[in-house]
Every structure is written in structure tokens, then in C-alpha cells.
Amino acid sequence: LGNVLDRDGELRLLDFDDCMIGPAVQDLWLALGGRDAATTELRENFLESYEQFRRFDRTELRLIEPLRGLRMAHYAAWLARRWHDPIFPRNWPHFGTEESWERETIDLEEQAIVVARVERGGSIAPPAAAEDEEALTNKDLFWDWDG
């Protein structure tokens, strides 16, 4: 994290200009966005400390995956809007290539599946191969799907 400094053995947080512009969980998941057990434990420890100062609505945790998908799309748009700046093609030479859009599409499709799974009360982890989970349809992935 670029906004956490270690000074004399103490962690100091700074740069809160993008904080508190959405649900509290948005600030949390950006700092602790992993899906693994270690991140889940860190997130829980953070929340226990956080709640010593302010209440946290844990039902907001279900927003992590939709916010992750939104962030993915927003990041691609952010790069595209700044592509005229010469520093961007130098630092993101893969952006805008057929391969990058293919990867972006696959990532967003996978994220949509995770969001739908969590919305139905499931885990962020894919089901075990032996499980016979009902297949997702376009209606699960697109709110305005009529077909």
C-alpha cells in the first residue's frame, strides 16, 4: 500500500482524499482486497480494531465483489481517458491490445460469475468440480435481461 508509512515501527495512514465517497466497505476492500484466508483474517482483525472507534455494518461486506467489478471497469476507463498522455503508453504498453481486451473481458465475465454466486448466498470460491451447481444464465449476470 502506498498510503501506509512505517515510521519508527508504527504504521501511519495518509491520503484519505478518496475515502468516504461511498460505503465504508469500499475503503476497506481497496486496502484488503484479496480473497484468500490470510486477507480474510487481516480484514477481520482490522474490523475488530475499527469497531473500537466506530460501528461497521458488516452486511456491507457483500458489496466487495460488486465493487471489485466496478473498479475493474473504472480502471480500464481511467487508462483509456489518459491514453493521450505519453507516460501511459510507456507504462501500460499492453493496454488496448487485442490480448488485453480479451483478458479484460474474461476477467469481467469471471467477476460477474463471482458477484452472482455471492448474491445467491454462495462463496467467492468456485464450487468444487463434484458439486452440481445450477448454471448461471444471462438473467443472473445482467439486471436488464428480458430473454
Residues covered by each model-derived region:
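Active-site acidic catalytic loop and adjacent metal/ATP-binding pocket
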Residues: 1-28, 32, 135-147
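All-alpha amphipathic helical-bundle segments outside canonical DNA-binding/catalytic cores
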Residues: 58-68, 121
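Hydrophobic/basic alpha-helical segments enriched in Actinobacteria
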Residues: 1, 5-14, 21-22, 37-44, ...
